[in-house]
């Protein structure tokens, strides 16, 4: 399922930057529990929030979706 694959990719990228879920969620103005559910593939995330995550990770949308 794409939500699970995307969530795993987001988590991998966040961890590679040494960020906790809480600190990252706060930095992109997203509720931590909502963000955690995205990483766990339990949310159908909007493109607006996907863009927030990509910007927070300082990567392009193309890079975010690579390997998804």
Model-identified regions with their sequence ranges:
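Alpha-helical residues within the helix-turn-helix
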Residues: 15, 26, 55
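Helix-turn-helix DNA-binding elements, focusing on the entry/boundary residues of the two helices
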Residues: 10, 21, 32, 47-50
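DNA major-groove recognition helix of helix-turn-helix/homeodomain DNA-binding modules
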Residues: 49-63
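Short amphipathic recognition helices of helix-turn-helix/homeodomain-type DNA-binding modules
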Residues: 65-68
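A short, Lys/Arg-rich alpha-helix, primarily the initiator
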Residues: 1-16
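Short alpha-helical DNA-recognition segment
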Residues: 19-37
